[in-house]
Amino acid sequence: MTALANIRNFSIIAHIDHGKSTLADRFIQMCGALQDREMQAQVLDSMDIERERGITIKAQSVTLYYDHPNGERYQLNFIDTPGHVDFSYEVSRSLAACEGALLVVDAAQGVEAQSVANCYTAVDQGLEVMAVLNKIDLPQVEPERVIQEIEDIIGIDAVDAPRVSAKSGLGVDKLLEALVEFIPAPTGDRDAPLQALIIDSWFDNYLGVVSLVRVRQGTIKKGDKLYIKSTKDAHLVGSIGVFTPKPLDTGILEAGEVGFIIAGIKDIAGAPVGDTITHASTPDVDRIPGFKQITPQVYAGMFPVESTDFEKFREALQKLQINDASLFFEPDTSDALGFGFRCGFLGMLHMEIIQERLEREYDLDLITTAPSVIYEIVKKDGSIIYVDNPSRLPEPNNIEEFREPIARCQILVPQDYLGNVMTLCIERRGVQVDMRFMGRQVQLIFDIPMGEVVMDFFDRLKSVSRGFASLDYNFERYQVDKLVKVDVLINGDKVDALAMIVHETQSRYRGNALVTKMKELIPRQMFDVAIQAAIGSQIIGRSTVKAMRKDVLAKCYGGDVSRKKKLLSKQKAGKKRMKQVGNVEIPQEAFLAVLQVD
């Protein structure tokens, strides 16, 4: 049992690639939580995708025991959080369990937009934020400039910020000492009725639902009967403990501590994230104010290639949803693709990762349609509807006003690339709101249509600024504009999954570019294939895929039968990823061609 005064709960927040996960590895190593032979890079990034891409997607918690030079032993509960803008909701959830946060800034690159956004989130939640300069052993570091930037842009005192190298471990011991002094101990009465917050939940095939909780007051023991406020269900605690980073069963969690609970909950919705847990004997305890519900920004249709996989796909989405509260889905049908789901995501990276996890972890073959944002439509009769799928748009003569979502974008960019970035924002129909010079960096604030931001704006921003610009955005408002729906017809049949909503001024260009792109992607058939783009009944672009006869065995002559079988099976595998539309086969790439039309 650790006294409250000796517990420290904190998160690590930073921009992508500023060294959060590496610093977490050093903490684990220095506190002796893992043997040297068990150490590996990114210990806390448990998903294969996280390791391959070198990013953190899920926040992970670890309990470490640190022996301070003053002779005291401290329990450090720390949570490693994601840095990418798509996963900022994970950060706000983690911060709800902490009293303090370490803001890790790369001493060579300086402050970036996501650090600013996450830092403001921490300050809003009443946390103490401590700046840390990382990568101090690089030859190109400029600590004085970066300290000035932290003070100018974020507004926290950074003169005494610890300087560390998470890679080599330099200065990390001093950081641990400073952290214990700086971050306040938690408060809470261990004898009061139980009140605990669910920070995260995930599904384990053997144990059921595993919940990560922060105990605000009271004590949870093995065998206790717990009451979950929102579902009003009671469950018996089977196992309780902390991650060190391996699960360690301690049998008890007390006020101020962060740990896991397994209570044999089999229903996926049985332990919602952000909910409050108490004892079944005291069900009237107040709910802890949770986190704000996040709303998806991007919607896309996902359809199984094999229609028999539909139920398997539904189960996979339900299991992912418990672990990822921001994933939204509802059943959807498409004339071209059959039955599937309309899914909502926080951004393009989030969408890619969900698709990759579905294909890897649940062995599904999926076709994804081009993503779209939510539009607000005022109909002629005055009613307002929200449309996230171009194919569900009312007829043009029934629309009074077409409103698109606008994102408030905060961009930090070195002065050298300011011109390029402003040109890009204006190309994307952006309107400048503010511009501030802060040392070598410039803070730009633009209002840009959300549809332009979520597609490939982030990638383009990185390329025009050679990777130096950084972006944070959030939804600002709906605004009236001249938007039209462009349909794609293949041999005269509309393909609902290829429809897109674009600005009137770009409609002809985008329609023609899409038709040309589709011509490259649709394989030649036994007959001519006409591809047309249309607004209403007016055709704005056309191209034709010429007919051919495709014979994969033509070059085999006599040959061995196994060689012929190999060629035929290769052709069959290619066809599996295609769907019949009328009488034309369309590959997956064609459904995403909408994205590549620039």
Curated annotation (Swiss-Prot):
Cited Pfam families: EFG_C, GTP_EFTU, GTP_EFTU_D2, LepA_C
Source organism of this protein record: Psychrobacter cryohalolentis (strain ATCC BAA-1226 / DSM 17306 / VKM B-2378 / K5)
Function: Required for accurate and efficient protein synthesis under certain stress conditions. May act as a fidelity factor of the translation reaction, by catalyzing a one-codon backward translocation of tRNAs on improperly translocated ribosomes. Back-translocation proceeds from a post-translocation (POST) complex to a pre-translocation (PRE) complex, thus giving elongation factor G a second chance to translocate the tRNAs correctly. Binds to ribosomes in a GTP-dependent manner.
Protein name: Elongation factor 4
Membrane-crossing residue ranges in chain numbering: none
Protein family: Belongs to the TRAFAC class translation factor GTPase superfamily. Classic translation factor GTPase family. LepA subfamily.
Residues of the tr-type G domain: 5-187
Lineage: Bacteria, Pseudomonadati, Pseudomonadota, Gammaproteobacteria, Moraxellales
Enzyme Commission code(s) on record: 3.6.5.n1
UniProt keyword Ribosomal protein, yes or no: no
Gene Ontology molecular function terms on file: GTP binding; GTPase activity; guanosine tetraphosphate binding; ribosome binding; translation elongation factor activity
